[in-house]
Amino acid sequence: MDLKKIAADIPDYQQFLTVDELNDSSHRLREQYPDLVSIRNIGRTRSGDPIELLTVAGGADCAFVFGGPHPNEPIGCMTIEYLSQRLCEDGPLRAELGYTWHFIKSIDADGMRLNEGWFKGPFTPSNYARHFYRPARREQVEWTFPIDYKTLSFNDPLPETRALMRVIDETKPKLLYSLHNAGFGGVYYYVSDECPALYDTFHQIPEWFNLALDLGEPELSFAEPYAPAIYRMLTSNDMYDHLERHGVADPGSVIGFKASSAQYAERHGSFFLIVEMPYFDEPRVNDQSVTSSKRRDAILQAMDIAIEHDNWIRSQHSSVVCELKLDTPVRRALEDFLAMSADFREADREWVLQAEETNRPATQAELFSNLYTSRFYKLLNTGLLARMLRDEIAGGNGSAAVASASAMATVRLDEDGRALEAALDYRAIPIRSLVGVQCCAGLAAAAYLNS
C-alpha cells in the first residue's frame, strides 16, 4: 500500500459538506457502485432523521468508522467522504486491506446542523466560535455508553449511541475508528493498545501535509503517553480515578461523562484509534526550545485565567437566567458547562502542585498550550453564551436584561477574538491536509492489524 500516493490524490476541498450534502453523496455512491455499496437505516436521531450505515463490501474482517462523534467535528465526515469513494474506486487497495468497511458519516446529525453556520467559511477562530455548538455531556453521543464503575452507573444511552452499539455488536470490528478533531494546535493520537510498529508512521504522516505534531500539554493531565503525541485512549474510568486520587469524595456524582465507544468495543477486542486534528495551527505548537518560565507556573496561570473567564460567563448567565424562555441545545450546553464541578480544576491544581514533572522549565509548545490554546477554547464558551442570547432575542424575548447581556457577550466575543487572532501567527489548515492525515493513519492502522 502506497500511503504517499494516496495522500497525493486527496482533493483540495474548499469547504465542509453539510449533513444533507453528505447524505446525498452517499446515495450517489451507491448508485455508482451497486455491487459494492449498500446503505441501511440502523436507527433514528433524537429529531427523527434516519441514521444510515454505508457499507463497502470486501473481506471477512470489519472496520467501523464513524464521523462527527461531537457535532463540531466535521473533519471526519470529509475523511469518510474521501475514503469511501477511494475504496470503491481502488480494487487493489480494497483487496490488499481485506476488510469490509462500515461508515456512518455523521453520527450526531442533529447537532452537526447547529454547526453548519461556519462550514463554508470564513475559517477564522472568531467565526468558528460565533457558530460553535458542542452538546452538554449528557447529550454527547460518544460519551453516553453504558457503564458500571465504582459509583458511576449509567444505562440510558441516546438513540444515536444505541445505533453505534448495534453496529459494534453486529460487526465486531477489528478496527474501530472514531473521527474526532480538536480546534487548535497540532496532530495527536489516541490508541487502545501499545502499537510501536505504527509510531514512526504516525509521526511521519503529518509531515506529508505540512502539519506539526502537538508536543505541548496533553488534553488532560492524566493522559498516558506511549510516544510523543501518541497516548493511551482515555476512559471515564481514568477520569474517575484521577478525581478520586486528588481528593474528590464521589467522582461519580460530578464526572458527567459515561463510557465511550472505545470502552464499549473492548468486549469484542477491537483496536481503537482517534486522530485529533486541529482546524488552526501555529508554529509554536511543536516548538521544543526551552523557555525561562516554569511549566508549573504556566499551567497555574492558565487555570487562573480560566477561572476569571468562567466567573464572567457565570455572572452574565445569572443576570438573565430568570428571563430566559427557550430550552435549546445551546442553552443546555452552556448551562452544563457552568454546572461542571470545580472538582475537575481543583484536582488538576493538586496534581500540578504535586507532580515533579511540572517542576521544570516549560518548552515553547507547553507555554503556547497554556497561554494561547487555552484562550481559544475559552472563546468557544463565550460564543455559546452569545449564541444562546441571540436565540432568545430571535425567538421573541423582549427582555431588556437579555438584550443588554447579548450586547455585552457579542462585544466580548468580538474583542477577545480579534485579540487572540492578533496574538497568533495562525493559519486555517487546508481541509485536504486534515482529511489526508486521518485517512492515511486509519489505513496504516488497518494494514498493521492484518500484518
Named regions from a protein language model:
Residues M1-I51:
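Short glycine- and acidic-rich boundary segments immediately preceding or forming the N-terminal edge
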Residues E52-A60:
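Short beta-strand-to-loop junctions in surface cap/lid or active-site-entrance loops
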Residues A60-C62, I75, L87-Y199, H203, ...:
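Active-site/substrate-binding loop(s) of hydrolase catalytic cores
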Residues F64-P69:
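Short glycine-rich or small-residue beta-strand-to-loop segments that form or flank ligand, phosphate
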Residues M1-F16, E160, P196-S451:
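C-terminal accessory segments enriched in acidic
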Residues H70, D108, A182, E219, ...:
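Catalytic metal-binding/acid-base residues of hydrolase active sites
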Residues H70-M78:
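Di-metal (Zn2+ and/or Mg2+/Mn2+) metal-binding site signature of metallo-dependent hydrolases
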